[in-house]
Structure formats: structure tokens, C-alpha cells
């Protein structure tokens, strides 16, 4: 499992003409979390990802999402699992199938909400337009 976590002051996901998720957090900052679920992920990898998203101290003043009550926009992104070492076309063989990845994404969202974190989500499997106002810019790659 991989995630790209970007510190943002706002972010949104649009499917067609509908905004399906958005966060606006100019005071605290928030995170845009693009998450790719791998075919070979350990069964508890989602728990580690929840902990990382909630507790990494990557907001202003070395605070975490949990520390300041910052929101998270969670978006599934299987392309993070792409392999590009050979040839000119990425291989998606390391990405989990939709039937496996979708419940994992739901577990991550639920796990964050159980910690009291406000979570907005993209729409699994949809073609989405993701907009964000990056702060810093500050972006980290997390692998579980």
C-alpha cells in the first residue's frame, strides 16, 4: 500500500459536474491522501495507513491531523502501484483488484472517522478531477 500525502489548505474531488468531496481548512491545513492498494498488501496494512495519515506530524508547527482536528480528503489511486522500470507502458500488476481495494479504502475511511477525523472521499473507480491548493508545497510518500 502506498499513499501520497499532501498538505493542503483546500482540496476537492469532482465526478462529472458533481463535487463528491471537498475540504477547506485555511487555519489548520489538511491532507489530500491519494492511496493505492497493492495486491500483495498485508491484511493489516490499512491499520498502519490510518495511523500514518492521522499521526504523521506534517502540518504546521510539526502537528498531525489528530493534533489539530484537520480534515482529510481520501482518494483511491491505483496508479500509485504502477511499475515503470521496463518499457514505456506502466504495469498495473501490483495493484489490487477493485473488489479487494474498495473494501480496504472503506476500512481506511472508517478507521480515520473512528479517530474523530473529518473525512471526505472521492468516488471509488470513477474518473475524477482532483483540485488542491498545496501548502509548502509539502508532500510525502508513505509505504505500508
From Swiss-Prot:
Keywords: Cytoplasm, Hydrolase, RNA-binding, tRNA-binding. GO terms for molecular function: D-tyrosyl-tRNA(Tyr) deacylase activity; Gly-tRNA(Ala) deacylase activity; Ser(Gly)-tRNA(Ala) hydrolase activity; tRNA binding. It is an enzyme of class 3 (hydrolase). A motif (Gly-cisPro motif, important for rejection of L-amino acids) lies at residues 136-137. The keyword tRNA-binding applies. The keyword Ribosomal protein does not apply. GO terms for biological process: D-amino acid catabolic process. It catalyses: glycyl-tRNA(Ala) + H2O = tRNA(Ala) + glycine + H(+); a D-aminoacyl-tRNA + H2O = a tRNA + a D-alpha-amino acid + H(+). Pfam families: Tyr_Deacylase. Its EC number is 3.1.1.96. One of its GO terms (cellular component) is cytoplasm. Gene3D superfamilies: D-tyrosyl-tRNA(Tyr) deacylase. It is found in: Cytoplasm. An aminoacyl-tRNA editing enzyme that deacylates mischarged D-aminoacyl-tRNAs. Also deacylates mischarged glycyl-tRNA(Ala), protecting cells against glycine mischarging by AlaRS. Acts via tRNA-based rather than protein-based catalysis; rejects L-amino acids rather than detecting D-amino acids in the active site. By recycling D-aminoacyl-tRNA to D-amino acids and free tRNA molecules, this enzyme counteracts the toxicity associated with the formation of D-aminoacyl-tRNA entities in vivo and helps enforce protein L-homochirality. Homodimer. A Gly-cisPro motif from one monomer fits into the active site of the other monomer to allow specific chiral rejection of L-amino acids. HAMAP family: Deacylase_Dtd. Belongs to the DTD family. This is D-aminoacyl-tRNA deacylase. It comes from Corynebacterium efficiens (strain DSM 44549 / YS-314 / AJ 12310 / JCM 11189 / NBRC 100395).
